[in-house]
A protein has these predicted regions:
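Extreme N-terminal starter segment of soluble prokaryotic enzymes
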Residues: 1-5
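Glycine- and acidic-residue-enriched helix-capping/strand-helix junction motifs
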Residues: 9, 13-23
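Short glycine-rich anion-binding loops that position phosphate/pyrophosphate groups of nucleotides
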Residues: 11-12, 69-72, 151-154
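Active-site-adjacent beta-strand anchor residues
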Residues: 16, 43, 149-150
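N-terminal small/polar loop signature for handling phosphorylated ligands or for N-terminal nucleophile
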Residues: 24-88, 102
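Proline/glycine-rich low-complexity loops and linkers
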Residues: 49-52, 77-169
Length: 169
């Protein structure tokens, strides 16, 4: 049986400044398909902690959804940590840049465009809410099993459901 796990990343969740809505949504989406969540882990905005967790989960065959840490603020480390955990460089994805510029115009520069920097080999996960894509990655020669999505519930809904629906059918 396939295991499913989630990471929910952000100091704002751990401090109580924001409430997590991802756990219950993922459980609902999986349950509707007769599947269940195997594990969940909350992580702060600590690059070493995030990288260590990802290195561990990349070595397993679990399908993992990660929420948070892919924005453009200084505490958004998840993209960099995923690249480090995979031992690949970060590269700017032209398709993601085009979506960000289409949404934000000139205000995409200088900071929002960083949201188009993904681990080498990443696939985009379209986001119809604000056109800032999520991404999926996996170890070399493996199917992509890790899906990185926005951390705010309103942004998760279409982007996350789209990714999960594509994966789960």
């Amino acid at each position: 049986m396939q295991n499913f796990g989630i990471y929910i990343i952000g100091d704002e969740i751990l401090s109580g400044k924001r409430q997590d809505g991802h756990l219950s949504k993922v459980i609902d989406i999986l349950s509707a398909r007769g599947l269940q969540l195997s594990w969940a882990q909350y992580l702060g905005d600590d690059p070493a902690q995030i990288t260590t967790a990802l290195k561990t989960s990349f070595t397993k065959s679990d399908i993992v959804f990660s929420f948070g840490g892919i924005g453009a603020t200084p505490d958004d480390y998840t993209r960099l940590c995923a690249a480090e955990a995979l031992n690949v460089p970060i590269e700017r994805h032209a398709g993601a840049v085009a979506e960000i510029v289409a949404q934000f115009g000139e205000s995409a520069y200088p900071k929002r465009v960083f949201m188009a920097d993904f681990p080498q080999g990443a696939n985009l996960i379209p986001n119809p809410v604000n056109r800032v894509a999520g991404f999926s990655v996996g170890l070399k020669n493996q199917k992509h099993r890790h899906y990185f999505l926005p951390g705010l519930g309103i942004k998760f809904a279409p982007c996350g459901k789209s990714a999960m629906n594509t994966l789960l059918g």
